[in-house]
UniProtKB/Swiss-Prot annotation:
Keywords: Cell membrane, Decarboxylase, Lipid biosynthesis, Lipid metabolism, Lyase, Membrane, Phospholipid biosynthesis, Phospholipid metabolism, Pyruvate, Zymogen. The record marks 225-226 as: Cleavage (non-hydrolytic). GO terms for cellular component: plasma membrane. The keyword Glycosyltransferase does not apply. GO terms for biological process: phosphatidylethanolamine biosynthetic process. Is synthesized initially as an inactive proenzyme. Formation of the active enzyme involves a self-maturation process in which the active site pyruvoyl group is generated from an internal serine residue via an autocatalytic post-translational modification. Two non-identical subunits are generated from the proenzyme in this reaction, and the pyruvate is formed at the N-terminus of the alpha chain, which is derived from the carboxyl end of the proenzyme. One of its GO terms (molecular function) is phosphatidylserine decarboxylase activity. This is Phosphatidylserine decarboxylase proenzyme. It is an enzyme of class 4 (lyase). Pathway: Phospholipid metabolism; phosphatidylethanolamine biosynthesis; phosphatidylethanolamine from CDP-diacylglycerol: step 2/2. It is a peripheral membrane protein. Heterodimer of a large membrane-associated beta subunit and a small pyruvoyl-containing alpha subunit.
Length: 262
């Protein structure tokens, strides 16, 4: 009963109309009134921000803020995969040959996540990684590796929350939420960067439109905290052993190593 009620409450508060109203408020000058308290509550690191707090005219501008030059460095090892965001490392593990994986007691379908069987088949037997962004984090998304962009597409119409409660009670939020997917071919192997929308605000803005992308290059931004899921082909990477669930990650930090193939 509790699970059903929670899901119903989520459904009633994250449709397009609600998201539209919240987005309009966040983009209005009226929202500037709550910027100081927002920054305090979420403990935003103001020393890293490109501009002073008072220079942000709306909550939207604060959500999508840039960082000062040099505040993040991208790992330069040619074999490294880097974190595409500032966030909290949630989980990683194998993708089953059935094109599914388990996280937080839920089974996720790669077919559902990517929209069809053909896309999902590439990642059977591969590896997934999940990174959660809170409202306090830097919200811009960068590429974890270099390669050629093979496809960009959007799926889903609503968004369950992706915090602990949402992951427990939501209806498979990582594969059902509004999400924007970019697939990259890197030296003949594929990676999917799945950008998952958060509760209320469905907006994921794409910034990168070229056919190629470089490791660390800016690709998109969230207009609120959310989650990214990385999918890699079989035998493509080895996750850094020291990574632990709940660990804070910074953009550009090494999270995996490309495996050499003879």
């Amino acid at each position: 009963m509790r699970r059903t009620l929670y899901r119903l409450m989520i459904e009633l508060t994250n449709g397009r109309f609600t998201s539209y109203i919240l987005r309009k408020f966040a983009q209005s000058r009226l929202s500037s009134i709550i910027i100081p308290s927002y920054a305090k509550v979420f403990q935003i690191n103001q020393d890293e921000m490109e501009k002073g707090l008072k220079e942000y005219r709306t909550l939207h501008e604060l959500f999508t803020r840039k960082l000062k030059e040099g505040k993040r460095s991208i790992d330069t090892d040619a074999s490294s995969i880097v974190s595409p965001v500032d966030g909290v490392f949630a989980d990683h593990g194998p993708i089953e040959d059935t094109k599914t994986f388990d996280i937080k007691g839920k089974r996720y379908s790669i077919v559902d996540m990517l929209g069809n069987e053909e896309r999902a088949q590439r990642y059977a037997g591969g590896t997934y990684m999940v990174i959660y962004l809170s409202p306090s984090h830097y919200h811009r998304i960068h590429s974890p590796l270099s390669g050629s962009v093979t496809e960009r597409f959007v799926l889903g119409r609503k968004s369950y929350p992706v915090n602990a409660a949402g992951m427990e009670y939501g209806k498979e939020p990582l594969s059902k939420n509004y999400r924007s997917v970019t697939e990259v071919n890197s030296d003949g192997e594929h990676m999917a960067l799945v950008k998952v929308g958060a509760m209320f605000v469905n907006s994921i803005e794409l910034l990168h439109e070229r056919d190629t992308v470089q490791k660390g290059e800016e690709m998109a931004y969230f207009t609120f905290g959310s989650t990214v899921v990385l999918l890699f082909e079989k035998d493509m990477i080895e996750v850094v052993q020291e990574l632990k669930s709940g660990q804070e990650l910074r953009l550009g930090e090494k999270i995996a190593t490309r495996l050499a193939h003879k």
